[in-house]
C-alpha cells in the first residue's frame, strides 16, 4: 500500500483526530514529528491543493479558452485558489464523502465551497491519480530528504567520535573470535562506511524521483486534447510545467492512469 493510500485511512477515523501528523502505534512510539507531518492528512490535502493550483496556472499559461474563445481561467480565480490553499475545510469534505463515496471529488467540492468563483476550474481535465499519485511521489521524496538529513547528522557525529577515539586501543574480532588490536575510532569508521553506502542509495533514489504528471484516464491525455482543441504541441507542455511548479525536474514520459507501482516497491 503506497504512502497516500495508507494516509487516507486515518482521515476516516473521526473529527477529533489531529490533521498535522500521521497516526499509528508505530508512529507514536518511533517516528519523529517531522516524519509524522510528512505523512499527515494536512500534508496530503495541502499538496492536493498545490497540485490543483499548478494545473490551473498551467492551463491558463497555455491559453485555455472557453467555447466563446475567451480565457477559461482568470488571474482572479487562481488568486482565490491560493487564498485557501492551506485552510482545509475537513468537515465539508467529510460530509460530502458520505454522499459521493469518493475522496478526491469530496475535496474538489470542499475546495469549491471556499472558492466559488474558481469552483469550475478545480481539477479541470484531471483524474484522481493526478492528485493521488503525484502527492504520493512528493510525500515519498520529502520523507527520503528527511532521512537523508538525519543520516548526514549521524555520520557527522560518528566522524567526531571516530576522531576523538582514533588512538584508543580495543580488541578486534574475526569470525567472532578475538584477533588483533584495533582502535575504537577505526571501528567507528566501519559504521560510517555502512551509513555512507546507505546515503549514496538515498541520494540516488531522490535524484530519480519523477512526478506522474497529468496523463488522464488511461495515460493518453485525451481530456486535455479535448480541452485544447486537439493541439498536441500544447498538451505536450503540460507535464513539464506542472513538474517545474512542483519542484521536480520531470514527469514519467509514459504511464497508464497511475505511475508504475515499481516506484512504490523501490
Model-identified regions with their sequence ranges:
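Short, Lys/Arg-enriched N-terminal segments with co-localized hydrophobic residues
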Residues: 5-16
Amino acid at each position: 500500500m503506497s504512502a497516500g493510500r495508507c494516509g487516507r485511512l486515518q482521515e476516516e477515523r473521526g473529527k477529533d483526530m489531529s490533521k498535522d501528523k500521521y497516526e499509528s502505534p508505530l508512529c507514536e512510539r518511533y517516528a519523529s514529528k517531522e516524519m509524522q507531518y510528512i505523512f499527515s492528512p494536512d500534508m496530503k490535502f495541502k499538496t492536493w491543493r498545490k497540485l490543483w493550483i499548478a494545473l490551473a496556472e498551467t492551463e491558463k499559461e497555455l491559453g485555455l479558452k472557453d467555447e466563446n474563445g475567451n480565457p477559461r481561467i482568470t488571474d482572479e480565480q487562481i488568486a482565490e485558489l491560493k487564498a485557501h490553499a492551506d485552510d482545509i475545510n475537513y468537515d465539508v469534505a467529510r460530509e460530502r464523502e458520505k454522499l459521493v463515496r469518493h475522496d478526491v471529488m469530496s475535496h474538489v467540492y470542499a475546495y469549491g465551497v471556499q472558492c466559488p468563483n474558481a469552483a469550475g476550474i478545480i481539477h479541470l481535465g484531471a483524474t484522481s491519480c493526478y492528485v493521488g499519485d503525484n502527492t504520493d511521489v512528493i510525500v515519498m521524496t520529502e520523507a527520503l530528504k528527511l532521512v537523508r538529513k538525519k543520516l548526514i547528522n549521524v555520520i557527522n557525529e560518528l566522524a567526531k567520535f571516530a576522531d576523538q577515539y582514533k588512538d584508543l586501543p580495543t580488541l578486534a574480532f574475526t569470525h567472532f573470535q578475538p584477533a588483533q588490536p584495533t582502535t575504537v575510532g577505526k571501528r567507528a569508521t566501519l559504521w560510517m562506511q555502512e551509513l555512507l553506502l546507505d546515503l549514496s542509495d538515498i541520494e540516488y533514489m531522490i535524484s530519480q524521483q519523477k512526478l506522474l504528471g497529468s496523463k488522464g484516464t488511461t495515460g493518453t491525455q485525451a481530456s486535455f486534447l479535448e480541452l485544447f482543441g486537439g493541439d498536441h504541441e500544447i498538451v505536450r507542455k503540460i507535464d513539464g510545467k506542472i513538474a517545474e511548479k512542483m519542484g521536480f525536474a520531470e514527469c514519467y514520459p509514459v504511464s497508464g492512469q497511475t505511475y508504475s507501482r515499481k516506484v512504490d516497491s523501490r
